[in-house]
């Protein structure tokens, strides 16, 4: 990296060299994040259909293959779906606000991509290593709901507008619980930097991870993440049995696809962030060989993959909650639990080190 920076300085001069090097570096990092993310989203849809198919005692997609190879049956399905979506027409209803109708999917997808800027894949692999990384992600994930509200209003449809209102209320309700759960992580790590949060979980084994002292907060965060991404059993914003398809009922073609790109990108983001702040990020479960020989980003991907499997497991297992049940869970269960845990955590942190040493609390409170 230093050699490349020096090369840019020699070729473009000391005035333009460093700036151009930084520009090229950031563009390459963005491409290195966005392209694998889009591929991961495509094959997450395939994995969802296959896994839920097996859970329901059926096969799932098994026809579309590469070059007619039988044992790769189904693996080309995401590519076929993408080609079909690109070729379909985007139909705009006659009574819709055309500008906002087209803009809404972009406003939903852009924050879902922007949030990935601060995700650390290993100690040195992060696009923007900022001190307020956790706060930045919370802000980006909150902005996606504006696109959903605009989509519901611009569609000029009662079904779409009702779905958008449901989604807005749901996101506001669970954003509070998620924020309070992240406050507990902030109190323990004393930092909003995601890299520092992972380093605060370093130790001999997974006993040092924040999952153990903050297990209720992990459950609150993860379930709130499922609710924020409008996934089953919290998918009342799309409730097919009640309001046809919710806020994207009038969308087709690539505009419809962009909403799902945002949804699945946010799913992967929630799983990645939970792995970083509760499951040690790139740290191995045991700090001995052969676990330490595995690259850190592999551990991060494995942890996130398990949490993504839980997303799919929920969809195949639980029926959809009623709207009032979702609101009750957020306001009367999750928010009080997180507030109590913040108070308890604050009291424990004020205990003298000698008292904390009598219990295994010094594993997490340094």
Swiss-Prot record:
One of its GO terms (cellular component) is plasma membrane. Keywords: Cell inner membrane, Cell membrane, Membrane, NAD, Quinone, Translocase, Transmembrane, Transmembrane helix, Ubiquinone. GO terms for molecular function: NADH dehydrogenase activity; oxidoreductase activity, acting on NAD(P)H, quinone or similar compound as acceptor; quinone binding. It is a multi-pass membrane protein. It is found in: Cell inner membrane. It catalyses: a quinone + NADH + 5 H(+)(in) = a quinol + NAD(+) + 4 H(+)(out). GO terms for biological process: aerobic respiration. It holds the Pfam family NADHdh. Its EC number is 7.1.1.-. Coiled coil: none annotated. The chain crosses the membrane at residues 27-47, 99-119, 134-154, 168-188, 206-226, 268-288, 294-314, 333-353. InterPro entries: NADH_UbQ_OxRdtase_su1/FPO (IPR001694), NADH_UbQ_OxRdtase_su1_CS (IPR018086). PROSITE patterns: COMPLEX1_ND1_2. NDH-1 shuttles electrons from NADH, via FMN and iron-sulfur (Fe-S) centers, to quinones in the respiratory chain. The immediate electron acceptor for the enzyme in this species is believed to be ubiquinone. Couples the redox reaction to proton translocation (for every two electrons transferred, four hydrogen ions are translocated across the cytoplasmic membrane), and thus conserves the redox energy in a proton gradient. This subunit may bind ubiquinone. HAMAP family: NDH1_NuoH (MF_01350). Belongs to the complex I subunit 1 family. NDH-1 is composed of 14 different subunits. Subunits NuoA, H, J, K, L, M, N constitute the membrane sector of the complex. This is NADH-quinone oxidoreductase subunit H 2.
């Amino acid at each position: 990296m230093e050699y490349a920076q020096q090369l840019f300085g020699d070729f473009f001069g000391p005035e333009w060299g460093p700036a151009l090097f930084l520009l090229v570096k950031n563009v390459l990092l963005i491409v290195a994040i966005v392209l694998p993310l889009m591929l991961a989203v495509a094959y997450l849809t395939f994995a969802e259909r296959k896994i839920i198919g097996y859970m329901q005692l059926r096969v799932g997609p098994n026809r579309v293959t590469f070059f007619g190879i039988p044992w790769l049956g189904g693996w080309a399905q995401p590519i076929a779906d993408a080609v079909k979506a690109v070729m379909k027409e985007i139909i705009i209803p006659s009574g819709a606000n055309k500008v906002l109708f087209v803009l809404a999917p972009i406003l939903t997808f852009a924050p879902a991509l922007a949030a990935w800027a601060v995700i650390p894949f290993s100690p040195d692999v992060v696009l923007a290593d900022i001190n307020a990384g956790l706060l930045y992600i919370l802000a980006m994930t909150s902005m996606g709901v504006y696109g959903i509200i605009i989509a519901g209003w611009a569609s000029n449809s009662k079904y779409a507008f009702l779905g958008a209102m449901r989604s807005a209320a749901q996101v506001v309700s669970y954003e509070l619980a998620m924020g309070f759960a992240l406050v507990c992580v902030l109190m323990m790590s004393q930092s909003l930097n995601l890299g520092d949060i992972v380093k605060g979980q370093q130790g001999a084994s997974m006993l040092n991870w924040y999952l153990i002292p903050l297990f209720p907060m992990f459950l609150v965060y993860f379930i709130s993440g499922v609710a924020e991404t409008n996934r089953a059993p919290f998918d009342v914003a799309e409730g097919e049995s009640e309001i046809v398809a919710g806020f994207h009922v009038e969308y087709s073609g690539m505009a419809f696809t962009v909403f799902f790109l945002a949804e699945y990108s946010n799913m992967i983001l929630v799983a990645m962030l939970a792995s970083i702040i509760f499951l040690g990020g790139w740290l191995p479960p045991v700090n001995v060989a052969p676990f330490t020989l595995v690259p850190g980003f592999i551990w991060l991907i494995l942890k996130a993959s398990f949490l993504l499997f839980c997303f799919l497991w929920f969809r195949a297992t639980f029926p959809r909650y009623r709207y009032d049940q979702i609101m009750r869970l957020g306001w009367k269960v999750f928010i009080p639990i997180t507030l109590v845990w913040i108070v308890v955590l604050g009291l424990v942190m004020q205990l003298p080190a000698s008292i904390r040493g009598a219990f295994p609390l010094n594993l997490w409170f340094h």
